[in-house]
């Protein structure tokens, strides 16, 4: 919309605007091209409702969810509209505007979160969540990857055993061969391989996102256990962005935890005091917690994105953040089963155990 509006300001005719619209649509479907975008147009808008919403869905779906009127135009886009139909086109456009305003009102909390992120980052509410989060963590460094850490989690040569060189044994091993760590205390997963775009571990294909497992049946008295902040914790434990930038990310995560626990005084001192002005009352604190949650979720998505961005490490072919959690859940499943329990279901960071004691 920004580019169409900017082109109209430059004097494009309706036909030229249509052709520009088609170029933009086709460039999105294929490789993104710059010959149909105007550099000055991006800041024509005040903000992007779709981008700041924490729930990503089409305007039509929002209309259904919010009980709003949805209007179809029913006219071919590639043909001129007769003058007697112009009113119908105007009503169609009106409906989109009214619906967008309703979505804005329904997602006001998301917009307040966007305002907070923009303020902390020193940018505008028209900047994307990804851009704001990038600035908060990396500052002005556009190529921070030279500080990033990445490793092969199946490399058994990195296993550290403090008792390995002792001239005697320490009795029966406390853990099985799949419970191993390197010198930094990071888990090693013996036998894990990533080949041909597939991850294999302990005789099964793990998948490239969160681990999913199920044993169909009817169960009762089920314990549902969650791993708190699995992906953010993996980023921190792996020191994925290097010492300096991982510390900033950890401060965002820790600040959100402190806010949720009402420890406002401690949270005020984090991120060089940038959060202090939003911790004056519980209402503002809730908005800040939501803003930090959006930023945290944005980071994981960018580490696994297939497009270039400052969080992307070209060595990270197997999505190490999600994979570390997935491999842990595989080990957890085997341990629970070894103790005589049924694992009814695993989904990313949660496990369901019937008749748990």
Each language-model region and where it sits:
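Conserved DEDDh/DEDDy metal-dependent 3′-5′ exonuclease domain
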Residues: 1-61, 92
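A short acidic (Asp/Glu
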Residues: 2-9, 234-236, 354-357
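Alpha-helix boundary/capping residues
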Residues: 12, 24, 66, 107, ...
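A generic structural-conservation signal
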Residues: 16-18, 72, 244, 345
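Generic hydrophobic, helix-prone segments enriched in Leu/Val/Ile
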Residues: 17-35, 111-120, 158, 163-164, ...
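Helical catalytic core of nucleic-acid polymerases
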Residues: 55-56, 76-81, 198-331, 337-339, ...
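Conserved "right-hand" nucleotidyltransferase catalytic core of DNA-directed polymerases
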Residues: 57-58, 62-233, 315, 331, ...
């Amino acid at each position: 919309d920004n580019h169409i509006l900017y082109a109209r300001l430059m004097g494009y005719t309706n036909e030229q605007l249509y052709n520009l619209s088609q170029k933009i649509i086709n460039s999105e479907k294929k490789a993104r091209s710059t010959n149909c975008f105007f550099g000055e147009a991006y800041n024509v808008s005040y903000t992007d409702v779709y981008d700041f919403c924490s729930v990503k869905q089409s305007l039509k779906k929002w209309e259904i969810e919010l009980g709003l009127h949805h209007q179809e135009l029913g006219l071919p886009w590639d043909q001129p509209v007769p003058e007697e139909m112009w009113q119908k086109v105007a009503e169609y456009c009106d409906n989109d505007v009214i619906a967008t305003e309703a979505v804005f009102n329904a997602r006001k909390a998301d917009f307040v979160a966007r305002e907070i992120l923009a303020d902390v980052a020193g940018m505008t509410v028209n900047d994307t969540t990804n851009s704001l989060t990038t600035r908060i963590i990396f500052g002005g460094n556009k190529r921070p990857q030279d500080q990033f850490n990445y490793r092969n989690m199946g490399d058994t040569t990195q296993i550290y055993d403090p008792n390995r060189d002792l001239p005697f044994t320490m009795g029966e091993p406390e853990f099985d061969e799949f419970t191993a760590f390197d010198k930094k205390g990071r888990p090693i997963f013996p036998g894990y391989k990533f080949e041909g775009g597939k991850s294999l571990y302990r005789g099964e294909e793990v998948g490239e996102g969160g681990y999913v497992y199920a044993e169909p049946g009817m169960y009762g008295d089920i314990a549902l256990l969650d791993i708190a902040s699995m992906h953010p914790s993996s980023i921190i434990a792996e020191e994925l962005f290097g010492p300096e930038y991982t510390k900033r990310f950890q401060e965002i995560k820790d600040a959100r935890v402190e806010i949720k626990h009402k420890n406002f005084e401690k949270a005020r001192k984090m991120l060089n005091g940038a959060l202090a002005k939003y911790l004056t009352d519980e209402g503002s604190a809730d908005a800040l917690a939501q803003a930090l949650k959006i930023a945290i979720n944005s980071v994981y998505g960018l580490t696994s994105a297939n497009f270039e961005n400052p969080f992307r490490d070209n060595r990270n072919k197997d999505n190490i953040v999600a994979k570390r959690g997935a491999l842990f859940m595989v080990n957890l499943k085997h341990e629970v089963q070894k103790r005589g329990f049924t694992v009814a279901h695993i989904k990313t960071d949660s496990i369901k155990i019937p008749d748990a004691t």
